[in-house]
Amino acid sequence: MPPSVCPPFSSAVVLCIDDDREVLECERSFLEAFGYTVLTASSCGKGLELASTQSVDVVILDYFMPTMNGQEVALEMRRLRQQAPIILLTEGEGVPAPTLNLVDAMVAKDRLASQLLPTIAYLHDCGRIPPLSYDA
């Protein structure tokens, strides 16, 4: 997506938490190319530590991780009063409703290139993605 469509927020800090280091590096490279400052954590514990000690504007969180899942990490962040919007990454599997109540947006990993920047921009400006309307 060209920068003119989704302008970067040069002061925004994005925390990416994923146990897959290759995914983290892709996220870092992609987001830094658009002017974001990126913090990465390859474990839930490190992610929670960074979220509690650094000023973070948006969190990108993988759902499936070995020691804690995305729901547990999001719950802990909310318990710690972490106010940064949370974007949950999934591989398309069903995500339990309680998890959806803890996060601000969800993006499928196979759609990162097209959906991640607009989602970050919206959350950074507005704080939460509006719920989908199923009315015809």
Language-model features and meaning:
Residues 89-90:
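Hydrophobic/aromatic residues positioned on beta-strands within the core alpha/beta folds
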Residues 40-49, 70:
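Helix N-cap/capping motif at the beta->alpha junctions
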Residues 1-13, 112-136:
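Non-catalytic signal-transmission and effector/linker regions of two-component phosphorelay proteins
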Residues 62:
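Active-site residues of response regulator receiver
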Residues 49, 71-82:
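Short amphipathic alpha-helix used as the core "switch/output" element in two-component signaling
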